[in-house]
Amino acid sequence: MAEPLKEEDGEDGSAEPPGPVKAEPAHTAASVAAKNLALLKARSFDVTFDVGDEYEIIETIGNGAYGVVSSARRRLTGQQVAIKKIPNAFDVVTNAKRTLRELKILKHFKHDNIIAIKDILRPTVPYGEFKSVYVVLDLMESDLHQIIHSSQPLTLEHVRYFLYQLLRGLKYMHSAQVIHRDLKPSNLLVNENCELKIGDFGMARGLCTSPAEHQYFMTEYVATRWYRAPELMLSLHEYTQAIDLWSVGCIFGEMLARRQLFPGKNYVHQLQLIMMVLGTPSPAVIQAVGAERVRAYIQSLPPRQPVPWETVYPGADRQALSLLGRMLRFEPSARISAAAALRHPFLAKYHDPDDEPDCAPPFDFAFDREALTRERIKEAIVAEIEDFHARREGIRQQIRFQPSLQPVASEPGCPDVEMPSPWAPSGDCAMESPPPAPPPCPGPAPDTIDLTLQPPPPVSEPAPPKKDGAISDNTKAALKAALLKSLRSRLRDGPSAPLEAPEPRKPVTAQERQREREEKRRRRQERAKEREKRRQERERKERGAGASGGPSTDPLAGLVLSDNDRSLLERWTRMARPAAPALTSVPAPAPAPTPTPTPVQPTSPPPGPVAQPTGPQPQSAGSTSGPVPQPACPPPGPAPHPTGPPGPIPVPAPPQIATSTSLLAAQSLVPPPGLPGSSTPGVLPYFPPGLPPPDAGGAPQSSMSESPDVNLVTQQLSKSQVEDPLPPVFSGTPKGSGAGYGVGFDLEEFLNQSFDMGVADGPQDGQADSASLSASLLADWLEGHGMNPADIESLQREIQMDSPMLLADLPDLQDP
């Protein structure tokens, strides 16, 4: 029997008493919902920006349920920024508290990979008329969602650098005891220099330290379904930083394949997609599920085994898949942390413990646990705005320095300052004559000498009292003259420059630090190359001592290879050895002005498609006399390579690896610069220009190839020693949607979708971040699990998930 519907709890924990379910026609409820959403759209799409004369609005970047964001230019400096407007910020308690939370968090954080507040505009209207909040933020051209689902090249180096910046910002955030809870590609802002910043902290929460805080943690929880951690879907009551690491794993997989990893159409479908890859949860996880019906549903499913990540992403980097597997685990305690992920070998290229700071002190969420009214939230937001400006003015006062010379007040009666002359008529002069001798004592006549009397001590002139460190008037005058001269010269050189004012420190980004580290590393490598070169020179001289003394013919003379390049060269050398004797060879045809030999079919054709080879262009036929060694059968690998007998015409055929189809139909990644690229699966065998393909009859024909110049290949491989290690900048970034600035989901897209909230199959699947996000709006459960609205509401209560926006808080909305 269906349970009665209940009104959703607000932020203050109040709830209406439960009542019976009122059966109403579907079209009536749909029309009322459409009117309510249209009203919300009219409220949110207020794009009139009142920013005064300080900023000039350029264009609108995006708008959503919570606000509008536009690009702007500061008139004084010309700096481009993003201004986020939150209209009617105090009409809905949930939205007002979200604004207060985001302002406090962004004021607390100072990190290169977290969006920063540059300014908060003060209200220009009286307090009673204050309704809209304007926040000035960093301007980022695009977001990661737009980059992934566009034609912009996304190499493995891009993926590595984006993941490093994301984990670096996440480590800082988690050290402040803050959980983002809504990480997704559209909330990660990106610019053309591949810099990444985490945005939209409206859903952030603190760590749960007691079971009583679980309900607080799940309040208005609406994380995008495709990136939602299993503990939130299964109500495991274990809410830690591992929630964000699951989202990072989903984003990581989406960058590797350029499509979503778990694009569930509804709650049930989402669980099915996760279990298709990770397998059935362990019995301990199933027993910890808080919702009884969810536990029964999982137990009713047949057991599944996890699928290897190499099968999900064939041809992907092994270290990348190793890190991905440690992020996506059912058990939250088994997932890798952000700090440990930064130490993974996949990110060793960028990892620097000294450049990955923590946040101190931790952020205090005490304000968020209080039951606040609209008026109290408004007062708190105004207080935050004034506090921001007070802090900024305090910092300006600290760094401001006005040059001024204050006269030194001399202490009255100080002898070391006045320095009176010894010949002064004053009675207190220190240099006066010694006093007269005292009168003789009465006694016998001085004709006798008393040997018992001690001779009087010699009278010396008393030295004038002098204080340590005293200076004369002449010295003081010289010092004053030198100071005045220095001051005049400084003021003459720069009248507006303050005396000894510290120069403003230019902010250093993570990319600049990385370039400095790479420059130091490059210099170390150059020194190592010089040492290796000298060592090779000595070895070459030793080898040539017993020979005829002619010049060395070593093609590797003077070149130093890295370990990776050396392994590639050794592999190529093994493949260039003479062919195995099992292969039959056909003698080359007689010389002719225009020889047109064709390759012969091997005795045992290799399985699978053969990738198109690339490499140096073939030389002319007359440049080679006699047979040339050909590549032998390569070692076992993902795709074997064809071999052929030696012949007089060179045909280079370096090895290539052909990728196979992905479990999720993932697109192949563009290989990073300097590494061999993957070929397109299923291509036909390659035939050099000028050579006809074998005829349809399948007659045996001859194949001629020659090894390319080893010196040329070595020089090409050695280019990796001097190339820029950072990923290439984007030539043109697609325009972002503004979601990363916390404006909420796009209402236009929401209104254009059907009320079943399903995601349409087809080419547009990867273009949307997700369907609607709220658990209370998941009407697709009707179709996915055969539920009626009352069942949906009761299950929502059971798994403790509320709505992102309480439409009942709007006074002028109609009740369905």
Curated annotation (Swiss-Prot):
PROSITE patterns: MAPK, PROTEIN_KINASE_ATP, PROTEIN_KINASE_DOM, PROTEIN_KINASE_ST. A motif (TXY) lies at residues 219-221. Dually phosphorylated on Thr-219 and Tyr-221, which activates the enzyme. Autophosphorylated in vitro on threonine and tyrosine residues when the C-terminal part of the kinase, which could have a regulatory role, is absent. It holds the Pfam family Pkinase. Activated by tyrosine and threonine phosphorylation. Activated in response to hyperosmolarity, hydrogen peroxide, and epidermal growth factor (EGF). Residues 502-519, 527-544, 563-573 have a biased composition (Basic and acidic residues). It is found in: Cytoplasm; Nucleus; Nucleus, PML body. Residues 2-77 are annotated as: Required for cytoplasmic targeting. GO terms for biological process: adenylate cyclase-activating G protein-coupled receptor signaling pathway; calcineurin-NFAT signaling cascade; cell differentiation; cellular response to growth factor stimulus; cellular response to hydrogen peroxide; cellular response to laminar fluid shear stress; cellular response to transforming growth factor beta stimulus; intracellular signal transduction. Residues 407-806 are annotated as: May not be required for kinase activity. Expressed in many adult tissues. Abundant in heart, placenta, lung, kidney and skeletal muscle. Not detectable in liver. Coiled coil: none annotated. Its main location: cytoplasm. Residues 55-347 form the Protein kinase domain. The active site is at D182 (proton acceptor). It comes from the Eukaryota. ATP binds at I61, G62, N63, G64, A65, Y66, G67, V68, V69, K84. Residues 140-406 are annotated as: Necessary for oligomerization. Its EC number is 2.7.11.24. The second proline-rich region may interact with actin targeting the kinase to a specific location in the cell. The TXY motif contains the threonine and tyrosine residues whose phosphorylation activates the MAP kinases. Belongs to the protein kinase superfamily. CMGC Ser/Thr protein kinase family. MAP kinase subfamily. Interacts with MAP2K5. Forms oligomers. Interacts with MEF2A, MEF2C and MEF2D; the interaction phosphorylates the MEF2s and enhances transcriptional activity of MEF2A, MEF2C but not MEF2D. Interacts with SGK1. Preferentially interacts with PML isoform PML-4 but shows interaction also with its other isoforms: isoform PML-1, isoform PML-2, isoform PML-3 and isoform PML-6. Interacts (via N-terminal half) with HSP90AB1-CDC37 chaperone complex in resting cells; the interaction is MAP2K5-independent and prevents MAPK7 from ubiquitination and proteasomal degradation. Plays a role in various cellular processes such as proliferation, differentiation and cell survival. The upstream activator of MAPK7 is the MAPK kinase MAP2K5. Upon activation, it translocates to the nucleus and phosphorylates various downstream targets including MEF2C. EGF activates MAPK7 through a Ras-independent and MAP2K5-dependent pathway. As part of the MAPK/ERK signaling pathway, acts as a negative regulator of apoptosis in cardiomyocytes via interaction with STUB1/CHIP and promotion of STUB1-mediated ubiquitination and degradation of ICER-type isoforms of CREM. This is Mitogen-activated protein kinase 7. It comes from Homo sapiens (Human).
